[in-house]
C-alpha cells in the first residue's frame, strides 16, 4: 500500500485535500483524523505538520508527500521535488523598515530574523554575506519593533502583514515557493509501490490540466476551417466532424481556460457559431 504524507493544517492543507479528492482519492472527513486508508486505491494517507513532511519522506517511512518547496529546502532533508502543484504560491523575501536596506549586501554584520533559518543561512552564505540569523517560530514581523533583529526574511503572499507592520520588501526574491510532491532523493524504484506512485502523479497531473483547460465546441463553414483550427489547435489536433448541412463542420478542441473568451470572440469574427465551452473534470494526456 502506498503511504503518502499530506499537510494537516495551514494554507497547504485545504487545497491539497481538494486536489486529492478531485484525483479520486478518499480524504478525511474530520480535521482531527491523522490517518486514513483508501482501500479502493490502496493508499494510506498520513496528515502531518507541513514542516515535518520532508523529514518523514526522507526517512523512507513514507513513500511520497505534499509540502511547500520552501519547507522542503529549509528542512535540509534528503528529499526532492518531483511535481509542482500550482497552489499555495508565495515568494520568500527580505523586509525591513523603509530605507533600512536596498539589497543583500546591506545585510553584512546585521541580524536577520526568520522562521526559515536553513533557507536564509544558505542564501547568505552563497553570496558571501556574513550576517547573524535568529530563528523565530512565527510572527517575525514584530522582531524589528522589539529589537530582536534589524531585518526579517519571510514568506510574502499579499504583503498585507508587512505593510501593517510598517515594513517593506527589498532586494531580489530569495526563492519562489508553491506546493510540491516530494520523494526521497535516493529512493529505489520498488515493483510494488512504483506503479502506484506513477499512477498518483498521473492523476494529479490530470487534475492540473483539467483546471487549466476547457473543452471548446463550435460549428464553422468549411472555407473558414483552417483559420478556425489555427485558433484552436488543441493539444494534438482538433476533432473535426461533418454536419448534416453541407459545407459546415463541427470542431472540438481543448483550449487554455484563461484564453477561452478571447478565442470565442475571434472564432465568432470569422463566422463560427454555436460556440460553447465545457469544464474538464479529469483527463489523462
UniProtKB/Swiss-Prot annotation:
A Pfam cross-reference name: HisG_C
CDD domains referenced in this protein's UniProt entry, alphabetically: PBP2_HisGL1
Enzyme Commission number, as recorded: 2.4.2.17
Enzymatic reactions: 1-(5-phospho-beta-D-ribosyl)-ATP + diphosphate = 5-phospho-alpha-D-ribose 1-diphosphate + ATP
Gene Ontology biological process terms, A to Z: L-histidine biosynthetic process
Cofactor: Mg(2+)
Subcellular localization, as worded in the UniProt entry: Cytoplasm
GO molecular function: ATP binding; ATP phosphoribosyltransferase activity; magnesium ion binding
Regulation: Feedback inhibited by histidine.
GO CC annotations on file: cytoplasm
Keyword tRNA-binding: no
The keyword Amino-acid biosynthesis is assigned to this record: yes
Catalytic EC class: transferase
Record key words, sorted: Amino-acid biosynthesis, ATP-binding, Cytoplasm, Glycosyltransferase, Histidine biosynthesis, Magnesium, Metal-binding, Nucleotide-binding, Transferase
InterPro entries: ATP-PRT_HisG_long (IPR020621), ATP_PRibTrfase_cat (IPR013820), ATP_PRibTrfase_HisG (IPR001348), HisG_C (IPR013115), N-reg_PII-like_a/b (IPR011322), N-reg_PII/ATP_PRibTrfase_C (IPR015867)
Pathway note: Amino-acid biosynthesis; L-histidine biosynthesis; L-histidine from 5-phospho-alpha-D-ribose 1-diphosphate: step 1/9
Family in the record: Belongs to the ATP phosphoribosyltransferase family. Long subfamily.
Function, in words: Catalyzes the condensation of ATP and 5-phosphoribose 1-diphosphate to form N'-(5'-phosphoribosyl)-ATP (PR-ATP). Has a crucial role in the pathway because the rate of histidine biosynthesis seems to be controlled primarily by regulation of HisG enzymatic activity.
Name of this chain's protein: ATP phosphoribosyltransferase
Organism: Streptomyces coelicolor (strain ATCC BAA-471 / A3(2) / M145)
Designated gene of the protein: hisG
Amino acid at each position: 500500500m502506498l503511504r503518502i504524507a499530506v499537510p494537516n493544517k495551514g494554507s497547504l492543507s485545504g487545497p491539497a485535500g481538494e486536489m486529492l479528492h478531485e484525483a479520486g482519492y478518499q480524504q478525511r472527513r474530520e480535521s482531527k483524523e491523522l490517518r486514513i486508508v483508501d482501500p479502493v486505491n490502496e493508499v494510506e494517507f498520513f496528515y502531518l505538520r507541513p514542516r515535518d513532511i520532508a523529514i518523514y519522506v526522507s526517512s523512507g517511512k513514507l513513500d511520497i508527500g505534499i509540502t511547500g518547496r520552501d519547507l522542503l529546502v529549509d528542512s535540509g532533508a534528503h528529499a526532492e521535488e518531483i511535481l509542482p502543484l500550482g497552489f499555495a504560491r508565495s515568494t520568500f523575501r527580505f523586509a525591513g523598515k523603509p530605507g533600512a536596506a536596498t539589497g543583500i549586501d546591506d545585510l553584512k554584520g546585521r541580524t536577520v530574523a526568520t522562521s526559515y533559518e536553513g533557507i536564509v543561512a544558505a542564501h547568505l552564505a552563497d553570496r558571501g554575506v556574513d550576517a547573524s540569523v535568529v530563528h523565530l517560530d512565527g510572527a517575525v514581523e514584530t522582531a524589528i519593533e522589539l529589537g530582536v533583529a534589524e531585518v526579517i526574511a519571510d514568506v510574502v503572499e499579499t504583503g498585507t502583514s508587512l505593510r501593517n507592520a510598517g515594513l517593506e520588501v527589498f532586494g531580489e526574491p530569495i526563492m519562489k515557493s508553491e506546493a510540491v510532491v516530494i520523494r526521497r532523493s535516493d529512493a529505489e524504484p520498488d515493483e510494488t509501490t512504483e506503479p502506484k506512485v506513477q499512477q498518483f502523479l498521473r492523476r494529479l497531473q490530470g487534475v492540473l490540466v483539467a483546471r487549466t483547460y476547457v473543452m471548446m465546441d463550435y460549428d464553422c463553414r468549411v472555407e473558414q476551417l483552417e483559420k478556425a483550427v489555427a485558433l484552436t489547435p488543441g493539444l494534438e489536433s482538433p476533432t473535426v466532424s461533418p454536419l448534416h448541412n453541407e459545407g459546415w463542420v463541427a470542431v472540438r478542441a481543448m483550449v487554455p481556460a484563461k484564453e477561452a473568451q478571447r478565442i470565442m470572440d475571434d472564432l465568432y469574427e470569422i463566422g463560427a457559431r454555436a460556440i460553447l465551452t465545457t469544464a474538464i473534470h479529469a483527463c489523462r494526456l
